[in-house]
Amino acid sequence: MKKLINAVQDVVVEQLQGLAAAHPQLVKINYEPRYVYRVDAPVKGKVALVSGGGSGHEPMHAGFVGRGMLDGACPGEVFTSPTPDQIYACTRQVDGGAGVLMIVKNYTGDVLNFETALELAHADGIVVQSILIDDDTAVKDSLYTAGRRGVGTTVLAEKVVGAAAEAGYSLEQCADLCRKVNSYGRSIGIALTSCTVPAVGRPTFELGETEFEFGIGIHGEPGRQRLPMMTTDEIIEMMVLAILDDGPYTRNVREWDRRGEAWVDKSLTDVPYKPGDQLIAFVNSMGGTPLSELYIAYRKMAEILDQRGLVIRRNLVGPYITSLEMQGISITLLKADDEILSFWDAPVHTPGLRWGM
């Protein structure tokens, strides 16, 4: 294993120390328990956004803390969910009195620990809500989830809902918008190589030189199938059609009923695409894929979407939700109405994403 690290046990702490040293005007770090928060938190009268998950996916989530996105992020160990005490402490830190919205990727550990933290925060008098992101069309269940995994739409939700909170949306409005973004977004990913978790020291899985994994998860979870290597155009066509041709997905998700002070099941269905829809298109590197290859992929994706009568209004290309050094890409398509486009265009200033200021 070759990595630019010192001691395996110090990887997460040292990268956070580097983040704080590089961006002292944007973020602060609390080390016990571990969380990242924006320098001006809590912002009085503004809904605060908190997210988190295992480290190894940088810049998500800590790199998206700042004006126009997250108020706080809770990084666990590599590919390991943050603990309830981390999430609870971060929630207390950023609460400015207007409530806290937790944006949670659908991985079993994340879901359980955020639910526990929400209950602790509620018992402490904090007004809090959580919304689940489950946009991965590759599989319905996996090693880490019941139901679809939460992947690329998470980044888009943090940007859109973060801007809405900055603009003065209430907690209920932010939750409704986040729910809409999740129902409008779909993703799928592929891997050409595995990744190596520092504490493990060997690849998570093996892929031959002439193979790729279709439908991979961001922790190296198995996808739909392992296939012989194809051209980029062939792979991208498979990915885009897997998103566009996937039927409506109905599932029950647990959400916190603040008035009833209990968890309740809600039935949600994602929204299929149709000709004329406006999109935000997100082509993402899994960590080891260069921009040149991302743009080759984007070229083919744009061609297919145009043939289907879908209109790309905005895009994001780069490594924003990674899997350590994995070679591979993911594609996320988000149906975008005027509200979503307006908040996408709004100013953002974080270590990992910045425009408009």
What are the residue ranges of the model-derived segments?
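N-terminal amphipathic/basic leader segments beginning at the initiator methionine
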Residues: 1-49, 338, 347-357
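Short glycine-rich or small-residue beta-strand-to-loop segments that form or flank ligand, phosphate
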Residues: 2, 47-54, 70-73, 99-108, ...
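Glycine-rich oxoanion-binding loops at beta->alpha junctions
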Residues: 57, 66-97
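Short, acidic/small-residue loops that bind anionic groups at enzyme active sites
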Residues: 73-78, 122-147
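Short Gly/Thr/Asp-enriched flexible loops that form oxyanion-binding sites at enzyme active sites
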Residues: 111-125, 144, 293-299
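Short alpha-helices
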Residues: 133-184
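Mixed-charge interfacial surface used for oligomerization/domain docking
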Residues: 169-294
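C-terminal non-catalytic interaction/assembly regions of soluble proteins
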Residues: 262-357
